[in-house]
């Protein structure tokens, strides 16, 4: 039976693979039929089952945070986070109380990977390094046990690819690290603030239009302005915006985007650029309309000059804002790379 992995599930799917046939001194295969199958990792008893964690991942993570694991030599598994490397993170969790388990679990998870990466708990049956003898690994633990290891993948796609290559592992459970790091949240809050400013500016410009007086538009605007993160709306919130054939629906769409909680930085950046370009096009359209209206008036020349000034300002802002955000994005990207190097230097090994 081959090992399988089930990503993004609330209930872990556990399956194990039969060990390959052993060979004796006469190069004859030994019968493994009577050999006990690997058991689920130690520490999964009622004694340490704080608040009855729902998944195997939660149970194992509690045990790792509590220090309930055995020493494993780092050289055995060269592309994973071994339990030995996690020992220094577990000392403060030994007096863990049940009511503190969920919070400390999240704090413990932060030590393992960056946001968006996949943490996988596996049981190593055979060494990933072919230069290590199989018997040397079995000597570390009983024959009916496996070595628990945390492995980190850069993305869910990378996890799916790598797990199909590692035929020697028992895949126990996987979980995506939540995006809860301070730097990421800070940058995301800054981008959301910029979007809110654009949203408010457009709202003020459209006070006399039917868009600004739309009840759904006002409800979303006021709700987001009065709360820190904003409520969560489904796609039905965009229905009123679809009834407007022109660019006046942009503020309502921006309001919908602002109320979503699970936005990536790239999505926010794209929305800022798109919103600014759309608002600029709308402003240019309005200026052109104003120019046509005042062609027959005495002040046609001054009206045209003012329109040209407004057009220049809009174009300048359209260029400046994306450039500034691009610089900020790459600064943040370099910062995350630096953080990863620091984590690697503290014996937390990220898989290649």
Curated annotation (Swiss-Prot):
Residues 8-21 have a biased composition (Basic and acidic residues). The keyword Thylakoid does not apply. Keywords: Host cell membrane, Host membrane, Membrane, Transmembrane, Transmembrane helix. It comes from the Viruses. One of its GO terms (cellular component) is host cell plasma membrane. It is found in: Host cell membrane. It is a single-pass membrane protein. Residues 1-40 are annotated as: Disordered. The chain crosses the membrane at residues 317-333. Its main location: host cell. Residues 22-36 have a biased composition (Low complexity). The keyword NADP does not apply. This is Uncharacterized protein S9. It comes from Diadromus pulchellus idnoreovirus 1 (DpIRV-1).
